[in-house]
């Protein structure tokens, strides 16, 4: 059953839709001081870092998801350049394949990453930011996100990272459960409104620990 709060939130977003996007971002953190347990690889997936030649495949997946896609529409070719810039500045994209089929995409950022519209997260030494996780529908519910995320965190820890951050959406509770199961804790929320046609959001309310999102 959908809660009253959820219905009210959906109604608020519908009311705001003609004027822009009303959204609530959940900010999560996780310590990397202790070893990161790796989930089981039940599908026998292979995981590797993406290369520039993989970008067309990655963009094809992201283009249908407005939360992940960095373009203004599914055919916005400038988005590819933004993902290319990520790779060239040293951020890492992890790809998981099952029997040669792409089963998951995820990113680890070490310097800065796209977070709230027009407000990137600026990272300090020892911090990482994971973002833009995507699992194609045939592989959802099969542990791919947990497997790749665990691999990313473990590798970052081996390379000296001590703290990780990520963002979630209020209306994706299943994803929040998965993060908490992997040791993440919600530490803050940001309510914001992005006017139609704008590139930078206006903040309506924020609470909890959100400081890393506002270092710019």
Task: Indicate where each model-derived feature is located.
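Acyl-donor-binding surface of acyltransferase catalytic domains
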Residues: 1-61, 68-73, 78-82
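A conserved beta-strand-loop-helix scaffold within acyl/acetyltransferase catalytic domains
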Residues: 66-127, 131-138
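Conserved GNAT acetyl-CoA-binding A-motif
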Residues: 156-168
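Short secondary-structure boundary/hinge segments and terminal tails
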Residues: 157, 174, 196-198
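Charge-rich, low-complexity intrinsically disordered segments
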Residues: 181-183, 197-216
């Amino acid at each position: 059953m959908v809660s009253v709060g959820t219905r009210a939130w959906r109604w608020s977003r519908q009311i705001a839709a003609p004027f822009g996007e009303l959204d609530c971002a959940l900010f999560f953190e996780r310590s990397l001081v202790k070893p990161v347990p790796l989930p089981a690889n039940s599908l026998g997936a292979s995981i590797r870092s993406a290369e520039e030649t993989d970008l067309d495949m990655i963009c094809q997946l992201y283009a249908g998801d407005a939360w992940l896609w960095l373009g203004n529409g599914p055919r916005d070719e400038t988005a590819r350049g933004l993902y290319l810039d990520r790779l060239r500045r040293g951020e890492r994209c992890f790809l998981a394949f099952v029997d040669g089929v792409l089963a998951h995409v995820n990113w680890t950022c070490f310097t800065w990453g796209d977070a709230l519209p027009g407000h990137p997260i600026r990272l300090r030494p020892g911090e990482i930011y994971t973002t833009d996780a995507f699992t194609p529908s045939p592989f959802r519910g099969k542990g791919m996100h947990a497997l790749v995320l665990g691999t990313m965190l473990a590798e970052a820890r081996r390379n000296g990272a001590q703290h990780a951050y990520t963002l979630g959406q209020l209306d994706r509770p299943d994803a929040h459960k998965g993060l908490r199961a992997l040791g993440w804790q919600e530490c803050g929320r940001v309510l914001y409104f992005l006017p139609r046609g704008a590139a930078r959001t206006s903040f309506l309310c924020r609470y909890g620990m959100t400081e890393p999102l506002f270092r710019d």
